[in-house]
């Protein structure tokens, strides 16, 4: 089995309706829509840390004697967009939104229907900002999530996922980032629980979990 989705007829109507809503929301919240390459050189993935920390989950190939990988995440592509032109601190925060098609070599035992597949379109955003803008921006994103979840009638719970064993950066930087996320989310009255060691290799995150009709929880969004 391909472990990837084929969509047709009413499924496409639903998908396109959601995309229309996505564009409406991101325009309202001042995001710039971007599109980034599907396949990129090994050197980029080495710079981002994915080659050393995520390669087992990536689909790789060789083209003209050079290593390439299909993107499992959109993050490096957003940085390429940022580097296309010079920026001033006055431009910050810069908010990029992307509906990026990503491929991840998930273990077969982890796959689950449409909830966990090997290829999917990710509603992704990357925000370039100054350190003193972190709190306000995290609050802003949380409110965007709240608006969208409320529309669809989706209650959610929040987890703060902290530094995993396999990570980049110093413990000091991780603690600063974890504290910044915790401070921002509590300042608007949101509760969270700590999920030790479940952060991404490149940083801590606030995971937003929803519940399906069978009572199972799924991580839907993250900051």
Descriptions of predicted regions:
Residues 26, 42-96, 180-207:
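Phosphate/diphosphate-binding loops
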Residues 1, 72-126, 131-148, 206, ...:
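Conserved alpha/beta core surface patches that mediate binding of polyanionic ligands
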Residues 2-6:
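Short, small-residue-biased leader/transition segments that mark boundaries at the very start
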Residues 7-12, 16, 68-72, 89, ...:
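Hydrophobic alpha-helical scaffolding
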């Amino acid at each position: 089995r391909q472990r990837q989705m084929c969509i047709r007829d009413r499924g496409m109507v639903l998908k396109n309706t959601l995309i229309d809503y996505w564009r409406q929301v991101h325009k309202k919240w001042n995001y710039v829509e971007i599109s980034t390459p599907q396949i990129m050189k090994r050197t980029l993935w080495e710079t981002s840390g994915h080659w050393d920390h995520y390669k087992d989950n990536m689909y790789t190939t060789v083209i003209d004697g050079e290593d390439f990988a299909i993107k499992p995440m959109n993050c490096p592509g957003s940085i390429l967009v940022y580097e296309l032109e010079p920026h001033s601190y006055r431009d910050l925060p810069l908010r990029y939104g992307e509906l990026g098609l990503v491929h991840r070599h998930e273990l077969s035992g982890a796959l689950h229907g449409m909830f966990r597949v090997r290829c999917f379109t990710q509603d992704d955003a990357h925000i370039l900002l100054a350190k003193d803008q972190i709190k306000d921006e995290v609050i802003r994103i949380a409110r965007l999530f709240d608006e969208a979840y409320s529309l669809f009638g989706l209650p959610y719970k929040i987890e703060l996922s902290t530094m995993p064993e396999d990570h980049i950066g110093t413990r000091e930087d991780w603690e600063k980032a974890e504290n910044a996320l915790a401070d921002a989310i509590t300042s608007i009255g949101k509760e969270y629980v700590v999920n030790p060691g479940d952060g991404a290799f490149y940083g801590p995150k606030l995971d937003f979990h929803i519940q399906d009709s069978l009572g199972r929880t799924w991580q839907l969004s993250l900051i």
